[in-house]
Amino acid sequence: MGQKARSAAAALAVASSEQKNNALEMIALSLEAHSDEILRANCLDLEKATQNNLKAAMVDRLKLDELRLAAMIDSVRQVARLSDPVGQIMSAWTRPNGLHISRVRTPLGVIGIIYESRPNVTIDASSLCLKAGNAVILRGGSDSFHSSYALHCALVQGLEHSGLPKSAIQMVGTTDRAAVGEILKGLDGAIDVIVPRGGKSLVARVQSDARVPVFAHLEGLCHIYIDKSADLDMARNIVLNAKLRRTGICGAVETVLIDNEALKKFLPVLTALQEKGCEIRATEDIAFLVPDVKLASEEDWSHEYLDAILSVKTVEGVEGAISHIKRYSSGHTESIIAEDMEVVKKFFNHLDSAILLHNASTQFADGGEFGFGMEIGIATGKMHARGPIGVEQLTSFQYHIKGNGQVRA
């Protein structure tokens, strides 16, 4: 499998933009042609999820329907419309001796993707890797096995119709956990980068055991700070969206911090959440003012709920918010709601998370919303890829140096 992937990666590295875009269109057409089979396979996974009492957030990630599948197919076509990063000149300069140096984007090579109950990752990872000239080896979880297998069959058929090697997109055909171990070892040097998509335990194992570079985040644990200068209606709309639009994604807010000088002003934000069925866990000063609020424990500040539950705390201005976030944040995404630009500037300058937002929902922490077409994850590390991993983040670079006979003294 590893050697087939390396061979395919070599072919993709020199494939033209037209060839890659044609392959993506063939994949989209194949997915459309096999939609019924894909949805039937997904039903098998959903039945198994029900039998295994899978959590609601996991079931939501697992579920496919006609609308979600259509959106996935559309995202393949969006990737085809993106600029091809391969061959782009990132920077160029000429040295005093006449040497002309260019830094040029190149494919990474072979990407290993390890994921759980997220059949969409099968499509997202394959499309982005193909566009960036990379081969991909997919290892889906047992929860999404039937869905991922059906999607992979359609992907391979699309590749075959395009003329590109079908081994450019391979899937590990077993749910045996030993297969994960082999991928983490790099398949004898075949894999260049691993991207995990799944729960905290999966990502932690990958980061601990991988012998090749990893692009990943351990968990979401996103924060919103509401400053005393914030507009109430804006704060209410943003927090409702950030928590409840989709509770089971890594960009969902888990903790809201409120300026203690304006707590009463923003209590309607909390009552609006409760009216939508959200459980509030908060500090005593908030529980005293808002009915049916549970007292937050120390564990709540570091817990990723992925559910309609929210931790809320009052803080002493933006400095208090920064202090709390630095202590508990996973480095994923933080948002500030404020009209005072000096406060916003301080928030941005003192926090080091991968994504910082001003007056916007944390659920914009998504490659599609960034204009990347789609993403295969959010990276919170500081080396190479950071934030949404889109097509550009799946490239490396070379230095191309042109001379006219220069030799070094």
From Swiss-Prot:
Subcellular location: Cytoplasm
Record-given protein name: Gamma-glutamyl phosphate reductase
Top-level EC class as recorded in UniProt: oxidoreductase
EC numbers for this chain: 1.2.1.41
GO biological process, one term: L-proline biosynthetic process
Family membership noted in the UniProt record: Belongs to the gamma-glutamyl phosphate reductase family.
Organism domain of life: Bacteria
GO molecular function: glutamate-5-semialdehyde dehydrogenase activity; NADP binding
Gene3D superfamilies cross-referenced by the UniProt entry: Aldehyde Dehydrogenase, Chain A, domain 1 (3.40.605.10), Aldehyde Dehydrogenase, Chain A, domain 2 (3.40.309.10)
Keywords: Amino-acid biosynthesis, Cytoplasm, NADP, Oxidoreductase, Proline biosynthesis
Signal peptide: none
A cellular component term, taken from the record's GO annotations: cytoplasm
Pfam families (alphabetical): Aldedh (PF00171)
Primary location group: cytoplasm
UniProt function note: Catalyzes the NADPH-dependent reduction of L-glutamate 5-phosphate into L-glutamate 5-semialdehyde and phosphate. The product spontaneously undergoes cyclization to form 1-pyrroline-5-carboxylate.
PROSITE patterns: PROA
Keyword Oxidoreductase in record: yes
Pathway(s) annotated for this protein in UniProt: Amino-acid biosynthesis; L-proline biosynthesis; L-glutamate 5-semialdehyde from L-glutamate: step 2/2
Reaction(s) this enzyme catalyzes, per UniProt: L-glutamate 5-semialdehyde + phosphate + NADP(+) = L-glutamyl 5-phosphate + NADPH + H(+)
